[in-house]
């Protein structure tokens, strides 16, 4: 059994066990059963262990796939969506640049170690979207090779993003960036997948 398949089994068995069945997969009201475990030390410990294992799996996977070496103990801050201006990957990229200069020029060190994970494809004729992908990769080159900033930040653009990489990324994510322009997202569902895998969700409103 593959590591990924094993992790899926662990996550599902935890949710099934806590909610009393697998009915939550078709009836989300069953998730109310989880509320009583919000402060349960044993449950939180198990959840942290599952998340840590998934993060280690992703770190191994991304290194084998495209040579990116990341710290599994860092915060995995993820934005995986079709590349579009309204989805605001550019805003996220500019935030990384801001962090870079705060560390590099201002000497800020009170920064949690963070790995920014992007996954996206651009429509063939969408020049702006392709430019944003190029910018994110350029920021990654700058950040990842800086002897000072790379101690705190790392940027990964997952190549050839599709469903298969998502199966590796989503279980490992700590922070799920859902920052599309308010009112523009017709029917986003990836946020739910992240939530069911224990990710925190900053959102636009």
Question: Could you tell me what each predicted segment is?
Answer:
Residues 30, 41-92, 96-205:
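C-terminal amphipathic alpha-helical interaction region
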Residues 1-5, 9:
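Single conserved hydrophobic/aromatic residue that forms the stacking wall/gate
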Residues 10-38, 46-51, 55:
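Terminal amphipathic helices with adjacent charged low-complexity linkers/tails
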């Amino acid at each position: 059994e593959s590591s990924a398949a094993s992790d899926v089994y662990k996550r599902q068995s935890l949710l099934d066990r806590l909610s009393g069945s697998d009915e939550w997969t078709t009836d989300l009201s069953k998730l109310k059963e989880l509320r009583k475990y919000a402060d349960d030390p044993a449950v939180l410990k198990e959840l942290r262990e599952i998340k840590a294992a998934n993060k280690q799996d992703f770190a191994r996977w991304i290194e084998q796939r495209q040579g990116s070496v990341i710290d599994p103990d860092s915060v995995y801050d993820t934005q995986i969506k079709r590349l579009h201006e309204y989805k605001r990957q550019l805003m996220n990229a500019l935030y990384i640049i801001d962090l870079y200069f705060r560390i590099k020029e201002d000497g800020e060190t009170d920064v949690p170690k963070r790995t920014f994970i992007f996954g996206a494809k651009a429509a063939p004729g969408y020049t702006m979207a392709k430019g944003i992908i190029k910018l994110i990769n350029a920021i990654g080159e700058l950040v990842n090779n800086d002897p000072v900033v790379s101690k705190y930040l790392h940027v990964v653009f997952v190549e050839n993003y599709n469903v298969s990489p998502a199966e590796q990324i989503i279980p490992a994510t700590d922070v799920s960036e859902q920052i599309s322009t308010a009112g523009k997202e017709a029917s986003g569902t990836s946020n739910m997948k992240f939530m069911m895998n224990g990710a925190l969700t900053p959102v636009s409103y």
